[in-house]
Amino acid sequence: MNMMQVMQSVVWAVLLWPCLVSLGVPLECKDEQGSIILCASISKEKLLDRVIQHAELIYRVSEESCTLFEEMFVPFPMRSQRNQAGYTCATKAFPIPGSKSEIQQISDKWLLHSVLILVQSWIEPLVYLQTTLDRYDDAPDTLLKKTKWVSEKLLSLEQGVVVLIRKMLDDDMLTTSYYEQGVAPYALQPEVLESVLRDYTLLSCFKKDAHKMETFLKLLKCRQTDKYSCFLH
């Protein structure tokens, strides 16, 4: 087994750890001191399957949150205005493959790296989103709980992957966040209408990126079984 295969196996184990509680899968991945260790008893295939299940769940929750926010706070005429108002997804500028042809051509390593970049880029914006949603008079508890849940899962996921990469690559210069420029646009206190559009854009962009995470992981899964017959739909 080469280094890439070893890295992928351990990445899948660490990626799995934060989501096990939410998925109800009985698995112990920690030692008595609380350190994350490789779940050697679980096959690579099963680990990846559970990671994909977790990614699907995150995407579904993001979709539900976006729909709920839209129904509660966004008048129909405003739903097509967020792009016209100059709001774009912060991750659009990141080196993440976007087109189907680009995604098909990148390596397994870069698929995983892209997932990590997306996770890290959303940690701070989702913390901001929790804060601003708390100021909405009629924000339903369901929306607040969904946002908090996703935020916590992303943070756990990021911490596990960073620890893994530092250990595997012996890279002391690795920081816990690659991208922070996505946070800056949300530091100001906008007016009510602007705030609604901005938060709506955040939720919509996160839903799109959550779908990318799911897509990348499913492509990775496909490549493990039939590398030459994996196509994006």
From Swiss-Prot:
Pituitary gland. Residues 1-24 form the signal peptide. Gene3D superfamilies: 1.20.1250.10. It is found in: Secreted. The keyword Secreted applies. GO terms for molecular function: growth hormone activity; growth hormone receptor binding. It comes from the Eukaryota. Disulfide bonds join C29-C39, C89-C205, C222-C230. Pfam families: Hormone_1. GO terms for biological process: animal organ development; growth hormone receptor signaling pathway; positive regulation of growth; positive regulation of receptor signaling pathway via JAK-STAT; response to nutrient levels. Keywords: Disulfide bond, Hormone, Secreted, Signal. InterPro entries: 4_helix_cytokine-like_core, Somatotropin/Prolactin, Somatotropin_CS. GO terms for cellular component: extracellular space. SUPFAM superfamilies: 4-helical cytokines. May be associated with ion regulation and reproduction. Belongs to the somatotropin/prolactin family. This is Somatolactin. It comes from Oncorhynchus keta.
